[in-house]
From Swiss-Prot:
Binding site for FAD: 12-13, 32-33, 40-41, 45-47, 173, 327-333
Organism: Pseudomonas putida (strain ATCC 47054 / DSM 6125 / CFBP 8728 / NCIMB 11950 / KT2440)
GO molecular function per UniProt: FAD binding; glycine oxidase activity
Keywords assigned: FAD, Flavoprotein, Oxidoreductase, Thiamine biosynthesis
Pathway(s) the chain acts in: Cofactor biosynthesis; thiamine diphosphate biosynthesis
Protein name (Swiss-Prot/TrEMBL): Glycine oxidase
Annotated substrate binding sites: 302
InterPro entries: FAD-dep_OxRdtase (IPR006076), FAD/NAD-bd_sf (IPR036188), Gly_oxidase_ThiO (IPR012727)
GO annotation terms (biological process): amino acid metabolic process; thiamine biosynthetic process; thiamine diphosphate biosynthetic process
Length: 365
């Protein structure tokens, strides 16, 4: 297939879409308004699971399961080809004092996932630094986290090594070029960039771009703030989650604690209120963090969408335009499956899963 495909947006979805397409089409161009991988893909925690997977629709679950199984080999492949290790780090995850534990266990039995109730004493034995007072725990082995800044760095390096891929950073896309009802390129600040197919993977900004065609994509920015501590490498052996807040151990002893959910438009300014709230959650989960130095505090913008179900597929009435966006809190979680499904659809291959729940048709205003 000798097509030129332009991918608008260089987050993990756009980069992995380009990585997959590069083996199938003639030329791939990735455009990003800033540096690739510096928005929500960089800012998130990197847990390779929805925070509460049993609360999501079957559509999200199908993508999550495929992606979770694929991540280890993706990490190994990128490390081998680029020398940049995305650090897919399997630690397991403890959920503490859930209100819907029965639903979680029923979901696990139905989906055949290794999630089970554990005695709280076993949780404290496994995670001695866990804060006091927790009464109940469930645990899922095999849950990993990925160091997302390193993931996007490795994807960027992999793409730069491919002769048929080009990255255009600081490339402002202002709209789409159309001829006879077909999208034939994008309008940039420097002129027209022609394409046989255009993929919109611009995260929280996707709706703004689609609006230039008179279409309403119900994707909006949802701000999330995180903080980072530096501890001993063996300080926290597993991820822990309680009351909507989590702590994630990296291999080098960094501990991420997050996150907030804020509707603040496109403002990414870290706030003092969020810092204090996140520090309080950190100490409740891990009291030894009391008084510890917060080595970083940042914010990112998630692409909020109804029920977190992404839009994957062609845009009706605008031949040549495709969507792979709207993953909300789970862009990194769902990326491998979303991008493989998208590649299957664009190239006419047999899709890895039923694409119907993600189709833009009938879901745009």
């Amino acid at each position: 297939m000798s097509k030129q495909v332009v991918v608008v947006g260089g987050g993990v979805i756009g980069l992995l879409t380009a990585f997959n397409l590069a083996a199938k089409v003639g030329q791939v161009v990735v455009c990003d308004q800033g540096e690739v991988g510096r928005e929500s893909s960089w800012a998130g925690g990197g847990i390779v699971s929805p925070l509460y997977p049993w609360r999501y629709s079957p559509a999200v679950t199908a993508l999550a399961h495929w992606s979770q199984d694929f991540y280890p080999q993706l990490g190994e492949r990128l490390f081998a080809s680029t020398g940049v290790d995305p650090e897919v780090h399997t630690t397991g995850l403890y959920w503490l004092d859930l209100d819907d534990e029965a639903e979680a266990l029923a979901w696990a039995a139905r989906e055949q996932r290794p999630l089970s109730a554990v005695d709280i004493s076993a949780a404290y034995d496994a995670v001695p630094v866990l804060g006091p007072g927790f009464k109940h725990a469930i645990y899922m082995a095999g849950v990993a986290n990925v160091r997302n800044p390193r993931l996007v760095k490795s994807l960027k390096a992999a793409l730069l090594a491919l002769p048929n891929v080009s990255l255009r950073e600081h490339c402002q896309i202002t709209g789409f070029v159309q001829e006879k009802g077909r999208v034939t390129g994008v309008q940039t600040a420097d002129g027209v960039l022609a394409a046989d197919e255009v993929v919109l993977s611009a995260g929280a900004w996707s709706g703004d771009l689609l609006r230039t065609l008179g279409l309403e994509l119900p994707v909006e920015p949802v701000k999330g703030q995180m903080i980072l501590f530096k501890c001993a490498e063996d300080f926290l052996p597993s991820m822990v989650l309680a009351k909507g807040r989590y702590a994630i151990p990296r291999r080098d002893g960094h501990i991420l604690v997050g996150s907030t959910l804020e509707h603040a438009g496109y403002d990414k300014t870290p706030t003092a209120d969020a810092l204090e709230s996140l520090k309080a959650s950190a100490v409740e989960l891990l009291p030894e963090l009391e008084g510890a130095t917060v080595v970083a505090h940042w914010a990112g913008l998630r692409p909020g969408s109804p029920e977190g179900i992404p839009y994957i597929g062609p845009v009706p009435g605008h031949e040549g335009l495709w969507l792979n966006c709207g993953h909300y809190r789970n862009g990194l979680v769902l990326a491998p499956a979303s991008c493989q499904l998208f590649t299957d659809l664009l190239t006419g291959a047999e899709p890895i899963i039923d694409p119907a729940p993600y189709a833009p048709e009938g879901r745009l205003g």
